[in-house]
């Protein structure tokens, strides 16, 4: 967001997480998932009575749990006090005030609606859902599939092939969600399919960029160094692979990304 000007008079900056938590009723977490645990180690203030919103598109490594479950398990935050913010919403376009649609998921839909009203604006439209786990898992998987799309791009596969790839990716996502968290959901909604499409195709997508570099022959480490940004899908691939050992869902695209990025590319 280096090209965006912010009104710093309306922003309070702090490097002390405990000071921020003490003064806030609602906490929004956007820390990349690989660093969440280390970041929270500094936390001494109880958060179980706070309203937690996570915009993290990853799974907590080692624990292999989605972020909402981690806050409940480790910090005693009731599920009804945790919401997930998701959807096709690249920060670059939001900062430029381009029309975007976000979904706020929470077991307590009334709380989701309250936050949705606060978040909404002339260029931010919102909807609410109670599919917290499904949306968190889909937010992880779409990054994995964006890496796959990037790899195909780096290998000079055409648009025809990538269309087939994404078509199969949404089916694979649906199989996984229906197995891990069965619910009457429509994966054609923007928070699932829309987020997958924008992450798989957009030039703003870090995961697609990472995959493109891998497809061009970069090692994982060299791609990460050159990008200077976190591609959550790399870490999410390993976590979902571990989780799927307990569910045995047929996931050939996930397996391909895992084999390329974690087995054969160093």
Segments from the language model and where they lie:
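Glycine-rich phosphate-binding loop and adjoining beta1-alpha1-beta2 segment
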Residues: 1-4
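Rossmann-like NAD(P)(H) cofactor-binding subdomain of soluble oxidoreductases
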Residues: 7, 14-22, 26-97, 115-117
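Fold-independent oxyanion-binding glycine-rich loops
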Residues: 16, 31-32, 55-57, 85-88, ...
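Internal alpha-helical scaffold of NAD(P)-dependent oxidoreductase catalytic cores
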Residues: 46, 73-81, 99-186
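General beta-strand structural signal in soluble alpha/beta enzymes
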Residues: 54, 81-86, 126-130, 188, ...
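Interdomain hinge/lid region at the active-site interface
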Residues: 145-146, 151-258
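Conserved small/polar residues in nucleotide/adenosyl-binding loops
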Residues: 264-265
